[in-house]
Design a protein with these regions (language model features):
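Structured catalytic cores of large enzymes
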Residues: 20-39, 55-161
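Bacterial Sec-dependent N-terminal signal peptides
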Residues: 1-22
Length: 161
C-alpha cells in the first residue's frame, strides 16, 4: 500500500511539475486558400507555373513575393512522449526564379528542399547513423498559400578552410 501511494504521489509531482504545453489557438490552414503537394524522397523540388495551374492557383499576374510554402517534412512522429512534436505547420524557405520582374509567369518557378518521408538518425552511442522509414506514409506533404510575404532562402558566404 505504501509503495502504491508513493508511486502515485511521485507520478503526480512529476507530471504537474513539468512546464505546461502551450498550443496555437488556430492552425495556419484556418484561413486563406491552400494547395497540397506531395514528395516521395529527400531532395530539391521545382514548382512551376504548370503545376500551380493544375492545383487550381490563379497564375495571372501572380506576385512571386506572395508565394508561401508550409510543411514539417515527412518523418514519423517521435515515439518518446518527452519529445514534443510541432502543433502546426511551419513555413519553409523557398527560392524564387522569376527573371527579376517579381511576377511568376512563363518558365518561372520556385525551389524548395524536403527531407522526404524517411530520415537518418544519429546514434551517438554506437557512432553511426540509422535509417528510419516512415511506416505510415510514402509521401511528405506540403501546402502552398498565396498571400503575405513568404519566407525566402538567403545566400550566405562560405569561409575558406
Amino acid at each position: 500500500m505504501r509503495y502504491t501511494t508513493a508511486l502515485l504521489l511521485g507520478c503526480i509531482l512529476f507530471f504537474t511539475g513539468t512546464a505546461q504545453r502551450i498550443y496555437r489557438s488556430n492552425s495556419v490552414l484556418a484561413s486563406g486558400e491552400w494547395y497540397k503537394i506531395s514528395v516521395k524522397e529527400a531532395g530539391v523540388y521545382r514548382v512551376n507555373i504548370s503545376l500551380l495551374q493544375s492545383l487550381g492557383v490563379n497564375v495571372s499576374n501572380l506576385q512571386s513575393s506572395s508565394i508561401r510554402l508550409y510543411g514539417n517534412g515527412g518523418e514519423m512522429l517521435p515515439e518518446q512522449n518527452a519529445i514534443i512534436p510541432l502543433d502546426d505547420l511551419t513555413e519553409n524557405a523557398i527560392q524564387i526564379v522569376d527573371g527579376g520582374d517579381g511576377v511568376l509567369s512563363g518558365s518561372d518557378y520556385f525551389l524548395f528542399y524536403s527531407n522526404g518521408p524517411q530520415q537518418w538518425i544519429k546514434d551517438s552511442t554506437n557512432k553511426r547513423f540509422r535509417h528510419q522509414k516512415n511506416l505510415y506514409s510514402n509521401e511528405a506533404f506540403y501546402f502552398i498559400n498565396i498571400g503575405g510575404s513568404g519566407l525566402r532562402i538567403t545566400n550566405r558566404t562560405v569561409g575558406g578552410a
